[in-house]
């Protein structure tokens, strides 16, 4: 077991290692065994983080001209669909040089805009370099080797990853920029958002941001079919910056009033631990509109923005328009006027109802 820990939220959490580290270790081990004609049980690799890993080799398979073996992915205490997967590498002797291929269960890139060219196996640049470096460190100078990375359960597990959204088919991606998995990593989630924005920007001049699956469902149930939706979680500001970096000038944000109201107060990370001003935004607008303090207090006494909307009923379209206009103003300020923004605000979960749509929105035209 990988014995490296970090502190997060007062808890001690165990780190893990990436699919890229697993692939590099398996490739190095298979190459070593192929040319040295002997089995080994542990292999050491370096990582871009300058942390050495000693990983246990599994499932050694010897054939006439090749050897394959696996490393089990250990995600530590991170919630990771690939944790526990066997990542295999097959080493075959060739006349000269080094070749890297993707086999069964390693995804194939089908769209432009990712870090790997269209049609190539989804082995990201850093893992590619790691694999090459580790293999060449044990490859005899007068020999050549072809490495094939494969993941027997890759197709199955890929359905639980971002790959289907990114146009990566038939398997998982071999990932990792540091070689180490840090539990509950905010950076890992933000990087996945950055990648999706980059990929969706290739064939689209505009993007639609949603906070989660409910926002996407809201659009699909109303017949929206374009492939320009990006799930941004709570990272509104970060996602805007990524879109601007890709030259995107038209952005629509679709969200529940509980999320969008936070932007009206200038909160660009909408996680409840960072900002929770949903009821305060509604209460302030009611006060500014001249409603009595008894109603304002009833709103503040609600547990959720959903409860506040249901309490108020159907007679407050001007309230949602005022909140929506403040959201648009905040977005414009954040982007320094460099993008055109629209918003769609809804409430509900099973049956979602539109509360406000900005005047220039044309998603359903």
Curated annotation (Swiss-Prot):
From which residue to which does any coiled coil extend? none
GO biological process: any one? anaerobic cobalamin biosynthetic process
Q: Which InterPro entries match?
A: CbiD, CbiD_sf
Q: Which Pfam families has this protein been placed in?
A: CbiD
Q: In which pathway does it act?
A: Cofactor biosynthesis; adenosylcobalamin biosynthesis; cob(II)yrinate a,c-diamide from sirohydrochlorin (anaerobic route): step 6/10
Protein's recorded name: Cobalt-precorrin-5B C(1)-methyltransferase
Q: What is its EC number?
A: 2.1.1.195
MF annotations from Gene Ontology: cobalt-precorrin-5B C1-methyltransferase activity
Name the keywords, alphabetized: Cobalamin biosynthesis, Methyltransferase, S-adenosyl-L-methionine, Transferase
Reactions listed under catalytic activity: Co-precorrin-5B + S-adenosyl-L-methionine = Co-precorrin-6A + S-adenosyl-L-homocysteine
Question: What family, per the record?
Answer: Belongs to the CbiD family.
Q: Which gene encodes it?
A: cbiD
SUPFAM superfamilies from the xrefs?
Answer: CbiD-like
Q: Which domain of life is it from?
A: Bacteria
């Amino acid at each position: 077991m990988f014995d490296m820990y970090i502190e997060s939220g007062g808890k001690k959490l165990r780190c893990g290692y990436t699919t890229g580290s697993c692939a590099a270790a398996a490739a190095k081990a298979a190459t070593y065994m192929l040319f040295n004609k002997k089995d080994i049980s542990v292999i050491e690799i370096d990582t871009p983080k300058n942390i050495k890993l000693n990983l246990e080799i599994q499932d050694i398979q010897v054939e006439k001209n090749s050897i394959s073996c696996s490393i089990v992915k250990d995600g530590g205490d991170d919630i990771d669909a690939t944790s526990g997967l066997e990542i295999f590498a097959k080493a075959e002797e060739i006349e000269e040089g080094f070749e890297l291929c993707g086999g069964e269960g390693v995804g194939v890139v089908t769209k432009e805009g990712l870090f790997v060219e269209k049609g190539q196996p989804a082995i990201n640049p850093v893992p590619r370099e790691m694999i090459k470096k580790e293999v060449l460190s044990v490859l005899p100078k007068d020999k050549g080797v072809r490495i094939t990375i494969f993941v027997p359960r890759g197709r199955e597990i890929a359905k639980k990853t971002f790959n289907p959204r990114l146009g990566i088919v038939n398997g998982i991606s071999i990932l990792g920029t540091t070689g180490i998995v840090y539990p509950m990593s905010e950076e890992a989630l933000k990087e996945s958002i950055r990648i999706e924005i980059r990929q969706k920007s290739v064939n689209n001049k505009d993007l639609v941001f949603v906070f989660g699956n409910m926002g996407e469902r809201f659009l699909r149930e109303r017949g929206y079919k374009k492939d320009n939706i990006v799930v941004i979680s709570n990272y509104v500001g970060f996602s805007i910056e990524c879109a601007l970096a890709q030259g995107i000038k038209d952005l629509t944000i679709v969200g529940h009033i509980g999320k969008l109201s936070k932007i009206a107060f200038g909160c660009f990370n909408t996680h409840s631990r960072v900002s929770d001003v949903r009821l305060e935004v509604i209460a302030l607008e009611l006060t500014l509109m001249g409603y009595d303090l008894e109603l304002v207090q009833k709103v503040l006494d609600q547990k959720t923005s959903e409860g506040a909307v249901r309490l108020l009923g159907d007679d407050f379209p001007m309230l949602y328009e005022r909140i929506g206009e403040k959201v648009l103003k905040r977005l414009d300020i954040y982007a320094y006027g460099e993008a055109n923004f629209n918003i769609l605000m809804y409430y509900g979960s099973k049956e979602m109802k539109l509360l406000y749509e900005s005047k220039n929105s044309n998603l359903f035209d």
